[in-house]
Amino acid sequence: MNKVLAEIIAGVIPHKMTRNRWRGILRYGLFNAIRLKREIKRNHTEPKFRLAVCAIAKNEGPYFKEWIEWHLAHGVDQFFIYDNESNDGTREILEPYIERGVVDYKYWPGYRMQLAAYDDCLEHHRFDSRWIAFSDLDEFIVPVKDATIPDFLNRFEAFPAVEINWLVYGSGGNKEKSNEDVMKRFRFHSLPDHYLNRHVKSIVNPRRVFTMIGCHEVARIDGKAADSHGNPITRNFRERTPQQDVIRINHYAVRSLEEFREKQLRGRASGTKTSVPMDYFNEYDLNDIEEKQ
């Protein structure tokens, strides 16, 4: 469906969460939605992967090893990586993981390609993955109460998606880039209830969703998404108190000042052509609490 028409139709729905869901369904297309529901009823393939992560990245090569190894150690089976015109050796850095069969790599050029990558991931991996997390290279999923992320997900079999809150980490005063791991370098984070931590990322059951709505929420086929405490979600994430006591996403949005300036130069895989403003650094450089060792 035409994007403008979809926005007009969705705009008349008063409840924000319902409106967002229908925005996603209309973007996916009503005929596609009907076709998908029929296909899901017929397809009983046993998923190959318990948990996969889908990410699109542009010139994030130096960060991949730590990010992949962290998530492998915490229960991720597979990574679907979409490379948005990287020229920093990303493909070569990922090669050992591609050879192991841990990374499924796609070169994904173009402008504003994040949602297109997520759509492609769902269409190609809907039946081979039990859960898919949609995340970025500056985000680390951290199970707090469980040993692994799948251990956490075992309590959510009845839900089509789980929304997990951020915990934003600042620069800690670091001006220059370093080869040390991100999670070791940046130990200072925001206050847990800071408004930025209301943002979420979703882990979805791909057989029960149509498509992503932006990078945070998903258009569900049925049922309600859950928060990390296992409660059905009835309010938009911007209206909810952040939860980080069971599981959280460490969000290293700025890293050091030098790395942020590199981020300004490369732009975002989500598609904006304008440079990331310095105001973003000032907003996300939150260093209120030092993480316990």
Where are each of the predicted segments found?
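Active-site beta-to-alpha loop of glycosyltransferases that engages the nucleotide-sugar donor
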Residues: 55-69, 85
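Catalytic-site signature of metal-activated, phosphate-bearing donor transferases
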Residues: 2-35, 116, 143-293
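Short, acidic, metal-binding catalytic loop of nucleotide-sugar glycosyltransferases
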Residues: 69-78
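Cell-envelope/extracellular polymer assembly enzymes that use nucleotide-activated donors
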Residues: 50-52
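Short beta-strand-to-loop acidic/aromatic patch adjacent to the donor-nucleotide binding site
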Residues: 129-142
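Conserved donor nucleotide-binding strand/loop of the catalytic core
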Residues: 95-113, 192, 196-201
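Active-site nucleotide-sugar/metal-binding loop of Leloir-type enzymes
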Residues: 119-131
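A conserved acidic beta->alpha catalytic loop
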Residues: 83-96, 110
